[in-house]
Amino acid sequence: MHKAQKFALGLLAAAAVATASDVVQLKKDTFDDFIKTNDLVLAEFFAPWCGHCKALAPEYEEAATTLKEKNIKLAKVDCTEETDLCQQHGVEGYPTLKVFRGLDNVSPYKGQRKAAAITSYMIKQSLPAVSEVTKDNLEEFKKADKAVLVAYVDASDKASSEVFTQVAEKLRDNYPFGSSSDAALAEAEGVKAPAIVLYKDFDEGKAVFSEKFEVEAIEKFAKTGATPLIGEIGPETYSDYMSAGIPLAYIFAETAEERKELSDKLKPIAEAQRGVINFGTIDAKAFGAHAGNLNLKTDKFPAFAIQEVAKNQKFPFDQEKEITFEAIKAFVDDFVAGKIEPSIKSEPIPEKQEGPVTVVVAKNYNEIVLDDTKDVLIEFYAPWCGHCKALAPKYEELGALYAKSEFKDRVVIAKVDATANDVPDEIQGFPTIKLYPAGAKGQPVTYSGSRTVEDLIKFIAENGKYKAAISEDAEETSSATETTTETATKSEEAAKETATEHDEL
């Protein structure tokens, strides 16, 4: 009996360990006190049925455990149980992550949803914009992240310090920033003040900035130096490449050995184009479908393509040709010189527009969307997207209301399958809805409200040139699920049906 009791107690202990969590679950009556008593908190607002939330859960747990020793708390709120609390904090989709420094200092989490990224982001949040660096803590500071920046500035050089602080405030989510006025330490690090050293745990190990301290120049130096010469393109790095502001060259290959071989072969090209084009390898077995997004065949590798991120233009290298140093160098040089036309993927132009919603394809995009005489509301959708399917009848109703209104010749309700057509807009998820006002086509307005006919009409009336307010008969309701956006990497619908990994970024 004694042994049985010990065995039972052992099972209970094991269960306690297995179920222990470093993520604190908060409710309405505990939320405010928890935020007030902890200097820095990352809170996740989630729903148990949400596929993206389920995918985040183990990553969030791992990050919470890692950050516990640094006294950075991770919390979560179940919005199906705490509806009022979630509405109070403006939650419109799941998961929503917010950084709290007290109840009055709240900012959205802008990092990736991976344990390492969450950990890195929150550590940077815990640091001051610029940390003091000395000979005693320099080596430790270098290890704070994959890339850190240290300014070596004389104590009397207030101007350089102010410029560096401006950059740090702007980019603090991306890199840890440190500063030292120790001339001997600067000399030991091989620089003379004023200078900035970017320390990194890849490529050549560090990069030095010794030009005049100007915000734009330092920003460019940081972004260029912190990007691997030839990095790895995947879910954790993709958004960073997309936000870098320069073209991205993809090297597709099916094996790690082949990716390394091609990287070594093309490295001199990447070095010559540093700061002009980012280069990265991509696993063709895991993410081969992304080749199709670049207008490459998805069954013929290795392959190479360049994406002009700002204009969302694709420049695929001929897959019938061998990837050699000479061939890729010539291709890249021609791209930089503007000698290559972008490849455009488009469905056929509809022979006739049927229905109240105008169908847009790549070949008629400019003609319809950029018609300067009309306010054009356009939905960028994906056929597999569950939220797009849910929106469809409401969007048709919206189109019908405008088609029979006094604004029928001045307002267009349109849609485009963004998976089958190249569009110049940067689309982060589906559905994305934008209004291109007449007379201001260069300043489209992205819709972020609930997906009801009433609210969409209000959006058009408030942001369009013609202030096209119309009435609608049916009263619509909205919920957080209606405003959720599905990322292009994974549809929530598919996440519910299968646990297999998707091969899109």
Curated annotation (Swiss-Prot):
Its EC number is 5.3.4.1. It is found in: Endoplasmic reticulum lumen. Coiled coil: none annotated. It catalyses: Catalyzes the rearrangement of -S-S- bonds in proteins. Residues 1-20 form the signal peptide. A motif (Prevents secretion from ER) lies at residues 502-505. The keyword Transport does not apply. Residues 21-128, 335-465 form the Thioredoxin domain. CDD domains: PDI_a_family (cd02961), PDI_a_PDI_a'_C (cd02995), PDI_b'_family (cd02982), PDI_b_family (cd02981). Residues 477-488 have a biased composition (Low complexity). The record marks 113 as: Lowers pKa of C-terminal Cys of first active site. Residues 489-505 have a biased composition (Basic and acidic residues). The record marks 51-52, 386-387 as: Contributes to redox potential value. Belongs to the protein disulfide isomerase family. Participates in the folding of proteins containing disulfide bonds, may be involved in glycosylation, prolyl hydroxylation and triglyceride transfer. This is Protein disulfide-isomerase.
